Amino acid sequence: MLSHELIERINFLARKAKNEGLTEEEQRERQSLREQYLKGFRQNMLNELKGIKIVNEEGKDITPAKLKALKKKNNVKLN
């Protein structure tokens, strides 16, 4: 989950980098926080996609096979 504190710290370091620069330790921290943020974002996006079913105008399921396979692998019900 993407915590408010994580985002606040990333934003603080971004402002500091723009205004006065970062120490090497802060640069490493910023990189680590960015990686954590991206990992959480990707996981949240994947969870959202797992819950999606795509249908055409006639109501026929046209969900891509790759997404169906992912849902099946993770035991997600296709509505």
Swiss-Prot record:
Stored InterPro entries: DUF896
Compartment(s) where it occurs, according to its Swiss-Prot or TrEMBL record: Cytoplasm
Predominant subcellular localization, coarse grouping: cytoplasm
Keywords: Cytoplasm
Pfam families: DUF896
Gene Ontology cellular-component terms listed: cytoplasm
Record-stated family: Belongs to the UPF0291 family.
Name of the protein in question: UPF0291 protein Bcer98_2342
Organism in which the protein naturally occurs: Bacillus cytotoxicus (strain DSM 22905 / CIP 110041 / 391-98 / NVH 391-98)
